[in-house]
């Protein structure tokens, strides 16, 4: 049984916990502790009730500063200094680092010094970590000596499996990406101050361009794609589910049918459970709570002049990513034991 702690219990932290109990992986992973500065009553309430994902299927109680879920008792901590967390006493195997602010190796090593054996960051990180993993594409690169690992981003997990499939079958020469991302909690409900002037504006009233390092994230997973991609991102007034508009120039001549065929085969084969394919007339809310990293919308595939291909990809940027955190942590332990 893997003993884990969650540091930072926001959207991703809570999704990880709920996904654990829904995914069937509870027999492999035990959440021992949650470190979050919010009041315990709010932690319990937001675990039980969620606007995006609905009510949690298990009853959650607060008893003696523990979250009780069935027979599981999860210690709730409120320690702002990661170096002071009781990971050694709790025998923590992996910390899910989900604060969104501890992103480099030096900061994450506070968890290691506190006694945790490994750290998995729920965010793109600095380049000095042991590895950045997109589960299903490069998790086989994990090694026993890896202690600090990044799970990349939700959009990197969405797009990289698709690029990998296209490159292996047709060769990818270059690409351009537009991420159409749901609003996030770094935006404002009504106009308010922010360092990014666009993010001073009300999230529910505008399509808001934001910076993205998605193209660099692709390079980290697929180094041979260096300088082949550029990306932009906009936030839209929805609370969950992201779409990615992917345009790629291929080395081989293709048509819509051949592109969709290889992606559907990959979804049913090598990337089963990670990549999906649909030809139904669906909209973004239909992918809410979908555990897969990416779903190709085959109805929107377009081909121009035989080599320029446009695809539409969907992902639940919370739930899909939370499920990959579970998968990557299991792969980290497997690598450590091999």
Curated annotation (Swiss-Prot):
Compartments, as annotated in UniProt: Cytoplasm
Report the Pfam families cross-referenced here: Gp_dh_C, Gp_dh_N
Q: Where is this site: Activates thiol group during catalysis?
A: 181
| Species annotation | Shewanella sp. (strain W3-18-1)
Q: What class of enzyme is it?
A: oxidoreductase
> Which residues catalyse the reaction?
154 (nucleophile)
Q: Quick one: a GO cellular component term?
A: cytoplasm
Classification via HAMAP family: E4P_dehydrog
Q: What does this protein do?
A: Catalyzes the NAD-dependent conversion of D-erythrose 4-phosphate to 4-phosphoerythronate.
Q: Pathway, per UniProt?
A: Cofactor biosynthesis; pyridoxine 5'-phosphate biosynthesis; pyridoxine 5'-phosphate from D-erythrose 4-phosphate: step 1/5
One of the entry's Gene Ontology molecular-function terms is: NADP binding
This protein's assembly is summarised as: Homotetramer.
| Residues the record lists as binding NAD(+) | 11-12, 317
GO term, biological process aspect, one: pyridoxal phosphate biosynthetic process
The name under which this protein is listed is: D-erythrose-4-phosphate dehydrogenase
- Family affiliation: Belongs to the glyceraldehyde-3-phosphate dehydrogenase family. Epd subfamily.
User: Which keywords does the record carry?
Assistant: Cytoplasm, NAD, Oxidoreductase, Pyridoxine biosynthesis
**Superkingdom of the organism of origin:** Bacteria
